[in-house]
Amino acid sequence: MSLVACECPPGPGLEPEPCSRARSQACMYLEQIRNRVATGTADVTKRDYLVDAATQIHLALERDVSEDYEAAFNHYQNGVDVLLRGVHVDPNKERREAVKLKITKYLRRAEEIFNCHLQRTLGSGASPNTGFSSLRLRPIRTLSSALEQLKGCRVVGIIKKVQVVQDPATGGTFIVKSLPRCHMVSRERLTIIPHGVPYMTKLLRYFVSEDSIFLHLEHVQGGTLWSHLLSQDHFQYSGLNSGSVQEKSQAQLSTRLSLMTPAELTPGHTLRQNRIPMEPPRTSQSLPPALQLQKEADAEPSSRPSAVFSSDPTEAPCGHSHSQVRRAGQSSNPAPTQRLHWVREGADRVLGAYGRGRGRNPPSANRASLGSGRAAWSLREGQVKQWAAEMLLALEALHQQGVLCRDLNPQNLLLDQAGHIQLTYFGQWSEVEPRCSQEAVDCLYSAPEVGGISELTEACDWWSYGSLLYELLTGMALSQSHPSGFQAHTQLQLPEWLSHPAASLLTELLQFEPQRRLGAGGGGTSRLKSHPFFSTIQWSRLMG
């Protein structure tokens, strides 16, 4: 029936029912179309609400890590509102359940932010000096970058638990280290992002995801200090007797199986360390200039001082042989004039020392030697002194900004192309649970109080510092010369030929009680710098 027929007046005896029925059917048809359009719009809305919520949550995560807590709280609130509105009309049951879990998680985090930061700030007016993560470090937050910037980068290698990544734009490489985020944020542990720390690798940027924080770190090309010292060429030019092929192979086996053996730079290779070692051992052709200078000096004695290391005419090379061992506090005989060396133990002895860690039984009081172990290397005290000064400045700056290392060990000491020490990056994040390397604890690199119930102070790092210097100066690990562990009554074993300033420094650093260690307490770092061992160091020049 046409619309024209409907508009014609009804004839005599005819009812208008056909016209009304047609009009009713048309209305029903239009209503069906409207319903279909409305349903399609709702489906689009259901899909869009997840996108809108994800945008808000992403902004909340960025602001959260940047410690802009008020903005983070607002973004979390907006994201939750979007999810609440969308979840009620979402027809997918599984998706609704997943969204409800996310809502609970984001509400919990928003509540933590309010209780830990906003409520305290609004109620009592927190001072900007109440924590290292407040206004004092505000400029460092500009390093926060969008996670999407990492997507175009290519992983070219894996070293321990970090990735070597290549920037496609520049072709340069950098290190990416991921830190897992915990859902419960500590109120006592503030986020501290150190900057301006001398002799420490630089944090270039950082990225935040829902579950992790990714650190974009400078790639120090020189590798670890220990990898250079343990390399075959360094064994030869350090003056160690090469001996027979069998003896040389045994030393190489011990080196390869030791804790400090660096990882091969191969994609997909994973190891257990949680710090950032760099390159495998280098040959003499690729040694840093500082070590090349030392190699030449050993081959042809010269009065010309190294361009990198300070000169001390009275020092004796470390790692010389000894007929007996003096305990800490005893006088020292003059250092021998010829290069003799300890007889190093086999690989089984080295591994046994590393495996024992801190035992409960103290070493024998009548022990008269460090065993039949041979020093891993022989270094001039001036070299160790320079590296020690650089490490000291790095630790001083970290402590000033409120960061403790807790497990400083050989994996954290890198060597740049100029021969200077570079610490791996240390920081602190409120949402990242601090973890201490168990291997560092077992091998006596961590202080005795680490892992206990007492609160840690800067003194724990000065123990680690002393343990590393002990190994650099003597050529033997502290755990190797003290295989039964270190207790309050343990006497520090020192070689007879060690200089008096070096022996004094090690004795004062390796004190079982934290408060008795050199460097602990107020003004401790100044006292450490003033120790006779550093008498030839020009601190202002190192800082420049």
Curated annotation (Swiss-Prot):
Positions with biased composition (Polar residues): 303-313
Binding-site residues, ATP: K151, G152, C153, R154, V155, V156, G157, I158, I159, K177
UniProt cross-references to Gene3D superfamilies, sorted A to Z: Phosphotransferase system, lactose/cellobiose-type IIA subunit, Transferase(Phosphotransferase) domain 1
Keywords of the record: ATP-binding, Kinase, Nucleotide-binding, Ribonucleoprotein, Ribosomal protein, Serine/threonine-protein kinase, Transferase
Ranges where the Protein kinase domain occurs: 145-534
Domain of life of the source: Eukaryota
Enzyme Commission number(s): 2.7.11.1
PROSITE patterns: PROTEIN_KINASE_DOM
Disordered: annotated span: 262-344, 353-372
Annotated ranges, domain MIT: 87-115
Family: Belongs to the protein kinase superfamily. Ser/Thr protein kinase family. S6 kinase subfamily.
Protein name, UniProt field: Ribosomal protein S6 kinase-like 1
